[in-house]
A protein has these predicted regions:
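Mid-chain, well-packed structural core segment of small domains
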Residues: 62-86
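Vicinal oxygen chelate
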Residues: 3-6, 10, 31-33, 80, ...
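N-terminal beta-strand motif that seeds the catalytic metal site of vicinal oxygen chelate
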Residues: 1-19, 48-49, 66-69, 118-119
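Conserved active-site tyrosine of GNAT-family acetyltransferases
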Residues: 18-22, 83, 112
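N-terminal first-folded block
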Residues: 7-42
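Conserved short beta-strand elements that form part of the metal-binding/catalytic scaffold
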Residues: 28-64, 114-119
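Short beta-strand micro-motifs in enzyme catalytic cores
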Residues: 38-40, 67-69, 101-105
Length: 119
């Protein structure tokens, strides 16, 4: 079995505007728990096993505004090493998420497209 897409993330220079746009356009709902620092968890209304997502601020020193897919992997370091061997690069090294929600990393494919990893 392949590695499934587990999460989408929309980053914006104006996350409030992005949240309003996407929730109104697609009839999604959003919740921004205080412990997530303004990051909005999105409920698309799809079944629980569907891909979930969030909307957050773009990092001026990191990822540009855009849409990022997160792929579930067993080993972040091994996947990043494999990506680099295939011509990709590491954009964000493995980083632990709050509340025991696993860890993430972000790679760039050979064309420069960002792809999130979640373990």
């Amino acid at each position: 079995m392949g590695s499934p897409v587990m999460w989408f993330e929309i980053t914006s220079t104006d996350p409030d505007r992005a949240r309003k746009f996407y929730t109104q356009l697609f009839d999604w709902t959003g919740d921004a728990p205080p412990e997530l620092g303004g990051y909005t968890l999105i409920d698309t209304g799809a079944p629980a096993e569907a891909v979930g997502g969030g909307i957050g601020v773009a990092d001026p020193d990191g990822l540009s505004p855009g849409i990022l897919l997160y792929v579930r992997v067993d080993d972040l370091a091994a996947t990043l090493a494999k990506a680099e061997a295939l011509g990709g690069s590491t954009l964000t090294p493995p980083t632990k998420l709050p509340a025991d929600n696993g860890s993430i990393a972000v790679l760039a494919d050979p064309d420069g497209h960002a792809v999130g990893l979640w373990a």
